[in-house]
A protein has these predicted regions:
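C-terminal functional modules
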Residues: 256-314
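Pocket-flanking alpha-helical
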Residues: 48, 67-103, 187, 207-213
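Ligand-binding pocket segment of bilobal, Venus flytrap-like solute-binding proteins
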Residues: 81-85, 155-222
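Short, well-ordered beta-strand elements
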Residues: 28-43, 60-65, 144-148, 249
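Short helix-initiation/N-cap motifs at beta->coil->alpha
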Residues: 41-42, 63-75, 175-187
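Ligand-binding cleft/hinge of the Venus flytrap
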Residues: 51-58, 140-174, 282
């Protein structure tokens, strides 16, 4: 009898395991619009538009307003923004930290690891001896005592301004040129064309790493950290209110190479971001299997076939 009972139990367990997994429930109607902030950097534009394409394929509507880092988390706190995928750490820790501490936002996942975010120089400047943060001060005259940053209020600029203010590395007499990502890149391009020395805020992933021959300076870990990662931040409670979108966001993890490819299409080939990221997804459909595991459309169907159809894949 015991043997028969065990055998029957085993058969029942086997039959249950063979049943298809129950699809997740669709999100409520209040989740149908997903508001994602685009910081305006090319990497931010790439990942935000890629995510928007996937969500649209699942039946969601999306808004991707351009938003400065300094107000992104405030917008999430007052529930005017749901998702922000460009929390660069550790450089932005002081910006997002207060909102994390008071529970206004939640760090959902790390969407990129192995990134760089620090000062860089052209390779010919490295060859001439500027290799480390401690070398910069000795090049003051050649550099016109200037470090090129990006837009005002950016976390990297704030770190550079603090470095100058505290005379770190003897840079108290330097100035930080604040403009924009494109403004900085234009300045770098002109300097390289003229073989002039320049120090600038650089990061990877970014097409600049393929377009320019540059070296990231050593010795700046106390300012920028040893390495960089990028996190997805959601407003407090969002992943619980909209668990299907939350599952997708937790599973969206990128590589440096993937972002470089999308960013190159956007910034150098001048392909509009929605189209560039859609083309990248069509060329790399294998990423969808993991990203969409257990995810459903707005009406509860498996998301993978719907997104593939949206992208024009067989």
């Amino acid at each position: 009898m015991k043997t028969l009972f065990l055998a029957a139990s085993a058969l029942l367990a086997s039959a249950l395991c063979a049943l298809p997994a129950r699809a997740a429930d669709p999100d409520p109607a209040s989740c149908q619009l997903v508001r994602m902030g685009d910081a305006g950097w090319t990497d931010a534009t790439a990942v935000t538009n890629l995510t928007a394409n996937i969500l649209q394929g699942m039946g969601y509507r999306t808004k991707t307003p351009m938003i400065a880092l300094s107000v992104a988390y405030l917008s999430q706190q007052i529930k005017q923004l749901d998702v922000f995928m460009s929390d660069w750490e550790p450089s932005a820790a002081s910006v997002v930290g207060p909102y994390l501490q008071k529970g206004a936002v939640e760090r959902l996942t790390t969407n990129l690891s192995g990134a760089h975010y620090t000062l860089a120089v052209p390779d010919y400047v490295t060859a001439a001896g500027l290799r480390d943060f401690k070398d910069i001060a000795g090049w003051a005259d050649k550099l016109h005592s200037t470090i090129y940053g990006i837009e005002p209020g950016n976390d990297g600029n704030r770190l550079l301004l603090g470095m100058v203010q505290h005379n770190d590395f003897g840079l108290g007499k330097f100035k930080v040129n604040e403009s924009s990502e494109q403004g900085m890149l234009s300045q770098v391009s002109r300097a390289i064309a003229a073989q002039q020395p320049i120090v600038f805020l650089a990061w990877e992933p970014h097409p600049m790493n393929m377009h320019f021959h540059i070296t990231y300076l050593t010795g700046g870990d106390k300012i920028f950290g040893a390495s960089a990662s990028v996190n997805t931040i959601v407003r407090n409670g969002y992943a619980q209110e909209c668990p299907n979108v939350g599952r997708l966001l937790k599973q969206l993890v990128f590589t440096v190479q993937a972002e470089n490819e999308m960013m190159q299409a956007i910034s150098e080939n001048h392909v509009p971001a929605p189209l560039a990221t859609k083309q990248w997804l069509k060329a790399h459909p294998e990423v969808l299997d993991k990203w969409l595991a257990g995810v459903v459309t707005t009406d509860g169907a498996p998301a993978l076939p719907a997104v593939r159809a949206f992208l024009g894949l067989q």
